[in-house]
Amino acid sequence: MNSLFASTARGLEELLKTELENLGAVECQVVQGGVHFKGDTRLVYQSLMWSRLASRIMLPLGECKVYSDLDLYLGVQAINWTEMFNPGATFAVHFSGLNDTIRNSQYGAMKVKDAIVDAFTRKNLPRPNVDRDAPDIRVNVWLHKETASIALDLSGDGLHLRGYRDRAGMAPIKETLAAAIVMRSGWQPGTPLLDPMCGSGTLLIEAAMLATDRAPGLHRGRWGFSGWTQHDEAIWQEVKAEAQTRARKGLAEYSSHFFGSDSDARVIQRARTNARLAGIGELITFEVNDVAQLANPLPKGPYGTVLSNPPYGERLDSEPALIALHSLLGRIMKNQFGGWNLSLFSASPDLLSCLQLRADKQYKAKNGPLDCVQKNYHVAESTPDSKPVMAAEDYANRLRKNLKKFEKWARQEGIECYRLYDADLPEYNVAVDRYADWVVVQEYAPPKTIDAHKARQRLFDIIAATISVLGIAPNKLVLKTRERQKGKNQYQKLGEKGEFLEVTEYNAHLWVNLTDYLDTGLFLDHRIARRMLGQMSKGKDFLNLFSYTGSATVHAGLGGARSTTTVDMSRTYLEWAERNLRLNGLTGRAHRLIQADCLAWLREANEQFDLIFIDPPTFSNSKRMEDAFDVQRDHLALMKDLKRLLRAGGTIMFSNNKRGFRMDLDGLAKLGLKAQEITQKTLSQDFARNRQIHNCWLITAA
């Protein structure tokens, strides 16, 4: 009896144990990452030919303690390598694991290689050659703490390489994991199987091979036992012949069918090629099709299973499309696949919950470094009384109501950018802004007391509902997460896409960037204030401090300002402001842009202006500013400096976002100034629900 070890992906060990026992293995013992088992020579070959789940089958040769590199060398050399393979055979060493002595796997592999070569040369035998790419013998050494385990890898290449897939092609899941997904899906061979996002067809091919009793090792050309001196060619040929006979019989007797589709024509062509090379091409119908066009291929029955590994995303900007995809798939399943089963394997359990289906079973597994889950569902047959359930239905109803109200109003106003929803319902704590045919959803970061998983699921429901209610393409929705603002975090960079969208606001044309920054380049709540500045600016010299992207300057320029001066500390935003001015034909010496610390510039400037707009941060302690700034504490000092630049009869429009801001009217009076609060006049319909989003004042000489 041979003592053997079969490795597998984490989470598949028990499934592999059952498979090996069915092949005739005895004394099976599950450990993390594999199964120890025993069997005769025939069982060795049977496990190599028939295991759909094992990554490798290895023959343990021994263990040794490693306290120095010499210990490793001597421990390896103690094995009788000259009885394992002939000197004419090539070999390779795979070394994994480190300890205090062996700190580099390449160094460990070199010491093992030296020990094996010296085992031959000391017996005056020819030196065996190393072949890293296609060796006759593979030696596997795993170092864990002070113990090195040495084994002969009888597989050669990993057993996931069945021989039907182009090795250069990328695959999101290995064939061994795909086989496990099929086994756990609840699908019964003989019933239809459909994969609507099949990629190169791995799940369907593994299922078809399982259903037709086709051995996964039947198409492999190389094995790790070819140079092994104990290899029994006669028994191997018997195992191989039996597999060929069973495959022919299984294919001839199989009557059901498999269906695969994908939106990428190139991968569908690859899937057809893979299926043909696997010997089951005639059983699978592949077609180029998007999930949105998914239809039941057998509407009159029989019932089958939809099985897939849908895409997932690690970047925030990919989530809206994925949420929409899963939400759409859930609706299609309910509408067209009543009575069928559904099984999805994913690295994102939150996305699976967008299906709005209740899972009957779920399994965990690792796909490389990723923690994944497989969930199985049964789709109930629809009845005349069945009503579709909308995710976040209360939110969807409110958004629908707001859309009806604001869409018509925005057209009448001549604006393309407005707020559709602003945390109207406390449990749906987001802001939804429309920018022409784009939508930005801003999630306010939930309190730490809220379960993170529930918060994420609610956000996914919000996105699915937003896409559905507004009827937008998923790639036109931008998702952002932000803390509740204590000031304008306008300088926080999020990305590098550099994609700008031209929008209109009354008679102004402006550039916005929806993806690269926390803010978009246009503060929507200041829309009316900007229009007022345009109406007040004719024939006047206009100053815009803390100008951001200069949208207020554009309105002043279009309103007939004699000159405009735009000051901001950020070169990025000044360049953006220049683009905005140029877009509206406002160029030349009359329109100056100055990069400076606004507070320092204000103290040193000696010019005069008729109209000044200042919208400072609530608080700032930027390293590039000379002093920390607090708008509540420092607004009087600010007004003192502004008064010096204000021409007789001139006006300052002062705005800030500090909740509960209190204007020091007595202090202003001592400066010879008076203030009129115009906050309510500057709040448009879309911000009427949030009366504290900003406060705004007109300040003139007393």
Curated annotation (Swiss-Prot):
One of its GO terms (molecular function) is 23S rRNA (guanine(2445)-N(2))-methyltransferase activity. Its EC number is 2.1.1.173, 2.1.1.264. It holds the Pfam family Methyltrans_SAM. Gene3D superfamilies: 3.30.2130.30, RNA methyltransferase domain (HRMD) like (3.30.750.80), Vaccinia Virus protein VP39 (3.40.50.150). One of its GO terms (cellular component) is cytoplasm. It is found in: Cytoplasm. It comes from the Bacteria. SMART domains: THUMP (SM00981). It catalyses: guanosine(2445) in 23S rRNA + S-adenosyl-L-methionine = N(2)-methylguanosine(2445) in 23S rRNA + S-adenosyl-L-homocysteine + H(+); guanosine(2069) in 23S rRNA + S-adenosyl-L-methionine = N(2)-methylguanosine(2069) in 23S rRNA + S-adenosyl-L-homocysteine + H(+). Signal peptide: none annotated. The keyword Cytoplasm applies. CDD domains: AdoMet_MTases, THUMP_AdoMetMT. Residues 43-154 form the THUMP domain. Keywords: Cytoplasm, Methyltransferase, RNA-binding, rRNA processing, S-adenosyl-L-methionine, Transferase. Specifically methylates the guanine in position 2445 (m2G2445) and the guanine in position 2069 (m7G2069) of 23S rRNA. Belongs to the methyltransferase superfamily. RlmKL family. HAMAP family: 23SrRNA_methyltr_KL. This is Ribosomal RNA large subunit methyltransferase K/L.
